């Protein structure tokens, strides 16, 4: 994967536009989770330190395109950046016809989704973004799978289009885990539905030495082995697909689980074998024997890819399976990469972020990369590197 890297360029005096992923949760005008901004700070700081005229932009939320809406303004992000950076920071609302930026100053360009044509990768809008800068830096891995004006179109028309350190790091880490993984390679795919992750399961079954399934996905595999899953979330129409995967890949299906009579935070957990599940019960977590068996597999792994929890970890009574898995990954010597919103929430909950080799900021982009799909923004950067 050959792209121009921002870190290889001299940015002094240049107008630099960074497309970051600053799509953070905001409540009452305050940023409530700063993980994505923190991840973007090093890129901004490198450009400022080099004496560039720095602009950064992002989308935030899902406003009606082409309309300004204060609820989706990047102003809370600007307030956050003012606290973290020693350089002056300001918000520019009207910038499409040009914006003055001083050396060593950071100008945040208001939410790109307020611009008509953003989502459709409009050429006129893309050219306006490109005219703002000498160097366009794509650093938002989380939106690299979308061909939009601020992630894709702008890069086609900018004088120079390059990958920022965050995007480069994501691509290198995923490449390391998927292209030439140290073996054994173990992949964990959790979540509620097989249907949404069937392509991922299929792709990983060809790469991984062992494929661990969890959550509602695992219930479909339990059912595929002929067990009653009661009222559990599962997909009867995908049992044949699950059987196919069981034949082609080593998938350790749970032998014991934690069940409840209702889907509720206060529901009592009962530990039982998968052969004993009653019609009125639903599986909400792995059992101890299954979780410890998986922990042992992870202990011996050399590469671990983790996407999705293995139980309803948001409920304290059904957290144990995910915690055992999370701690096994943290204790492993393997190169580990984790991605997806729920996975990141679990990592935060168990306080193991510093024990994971690489935490991906992308949800959909992470999955599409794992599926082997080409990400439009990355393809654009590769094409620009050839010119």
Curated annotation (Swiss-Prot):
ATP binds at residues 197, 314, 340-343. Its EC number is 2.7.2.3. Pathway: Carbohydrate degradation; glycolysis; pyruvate from D-glyceraldehyde 3-phosphate: step 2/5. InterPro entries: Phosphoglycerate_kinase (IPR001576), Phosphoglycerate_kinase_CS (IPR015911), Phosphoglycerate_kinase_N (IPR015824), Phosphoglycerate_kinase_sf (IPR036043). SUPFAM superfamilies: Phosphoglycerate kinase. Gene3D superfamilies: Phosphoglycerate kinase, N-terminal domain. It catalyses: (2R)-3-phosphoglycerate + ATP = (2R)-3-phospho-glyceroyl phosphate + ADP. This is Phosphoglycerate kinase. It comes from Pectobacterium atrosepticum (strain SCRI 1043 / ATCC BAA-672).
């Amino acid at each position: 994967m050959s792209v121009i890297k921002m870190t290889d360029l001299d940015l002094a005096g240049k107008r630099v536009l960074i497309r970051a992923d600053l799509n953070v949760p905001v409540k009452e005008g305050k940023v409530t989770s700063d993980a994505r901004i923190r991840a973007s700070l090093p890129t901004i700081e490198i450009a400022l330190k080099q004496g560039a005229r720095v602009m950064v932009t992002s989308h935030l939320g899902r406003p009606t395109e082409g309309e300004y809406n204060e609820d989706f303004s990047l102003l809370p992000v600007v307030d956050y950046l003012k606290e973290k950076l020693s350089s002056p920071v300001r918000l520019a609302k009207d910038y499409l016809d040009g914006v003055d930026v001083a050396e060593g100053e950071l100008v945040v360009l208001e939410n790109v989704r307020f611009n008509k044509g953003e989502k459709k990768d409009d050429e006129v809008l893309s050219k306006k973004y490109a005219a703002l800068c000498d160097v366009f830096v794509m650093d938002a891995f989380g939106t690299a799978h979308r061909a939009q004006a601020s992630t894709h179109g702008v890069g086609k028309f900018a004088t120079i289009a390059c990958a920022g350190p965050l995007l480069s790091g994501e691509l290198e880490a995923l490449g390391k885990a998927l292209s030439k993984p140290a073996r054994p390679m173990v992949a964990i795919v959790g979540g509620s539905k097989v249907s949404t992750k069937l392509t991922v399961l299929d792709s990983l079954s060809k790469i991984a030495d062992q494929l661990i399934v969890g959550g509602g996905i695992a219930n479909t595999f339990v059912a595929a082995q002929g067990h009653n899953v009661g009222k559990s979330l599962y997909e009867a129409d995908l049992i044949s697909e699950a059987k196919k995967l069981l034949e082609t890949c080593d998938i350790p299906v749970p032998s014991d689980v934690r069940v409840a009579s209702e889907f509720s935070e206060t529901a009592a957990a009962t530990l039982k074998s998968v052969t004993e599940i009653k019609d009125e019960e639903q599986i909400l977590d792995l059992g101890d024997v299954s979780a410890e068996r998986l922990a042992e597999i992870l202990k011996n792994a050399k590469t671990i890819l983790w996407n999705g929890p293995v139980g309803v970890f948001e409920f304290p009574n059904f957290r144990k399976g995910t915690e055992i898995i999370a701690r096994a990954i943290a204790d492993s010597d393997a190169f580990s990469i984790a991605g997806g919103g729920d996975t990141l929430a679990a990592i935060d909950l168990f306080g193991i972020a510093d024990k994971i080799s690489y935490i991906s900021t992308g949800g959909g982009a992470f999955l599409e990369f794992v599926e082997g799909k080409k990400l439009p923004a990355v393809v654009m950067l590769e094409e620009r590197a050839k010119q």
